């Protein structure tokens, strides 16, 4: 059985010293990896890493908390160019994050541009949402092309929100917090979700 980790940041500064060890272990486990971009630079790094290994793929995107003064049209143009790499299989990590102080207007604008990119390139989307489930849901509902083409990574809300996103055809990703001893509510969401 192959394992696919759909959300990695192996190129992050913290993991660079362990880079070779991680890649070796993944290879031994027959694991495929999606190295997820969250800035232009990390998207470029993801593509470079993917080019070195047949089991690594890349996504390109601007995380909602990664505010930049660069014009949105320029960001779009650069992301579009990056998305043409044959190892790019998704757009992400994109979404809304109201925990950090990134301007909401920027977050909505860059989210819309990146959804346009995903649609034009027929790529699935990796979403990041934090303290913005209602706003994100209302914004995303009209984007029908996302049905069965989107994952909401590190899901951390309740069964009601899980049901809402599953009804849109989204996949939900669960990360480390589901293992925390006091996080029974999130484990309840996990048991509610379909196995695939």
Each language-model region and where it sits:
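Mid-domain alpha/beta scaffold segments of enzyme catalytic cores
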Residues: 1-196
């Amino acid at each position: 059985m192959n394992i696919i980790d759909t959300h990695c940041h192996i190129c992050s500064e913290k993991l660079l010293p362990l880079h070779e060890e991680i890649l070796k272990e993944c290879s031994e486990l027959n694991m495929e990896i999606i190295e997820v971009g969250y800035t232009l630079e990390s998207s470029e790094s993801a593509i470079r890493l993917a080019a070195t290994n047949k089991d690594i793929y890349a996504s390109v995107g601007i995380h909602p908390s990664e505010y930049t003064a660069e014009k949105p049209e320029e960001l779009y143009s650069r992301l579009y160019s990056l998305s043409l790499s044959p190892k790019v299989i998704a757009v992400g990590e994109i979404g809304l994050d109201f925990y950090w102080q990134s301007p909401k207007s920027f977050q909505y604008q860059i989210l819309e541009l990146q959804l346009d990119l995903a649609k034009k390139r027929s790529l699935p989307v990796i979403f990041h949402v934090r303290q913005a489930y209602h706003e994100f849901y209302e914004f995303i509902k009209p984007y029908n092309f996302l049905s069965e083409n989107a994952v909401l990574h590190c899901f951390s809300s309740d069964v009601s929100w899980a049901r809402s996103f599953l009804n849109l055809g989204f996949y939900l990703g669960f990360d480390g917090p589901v293992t925390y001893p006091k996080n029974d509510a999130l484990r309840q969401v996990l048991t509610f979700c379909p196995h695939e």
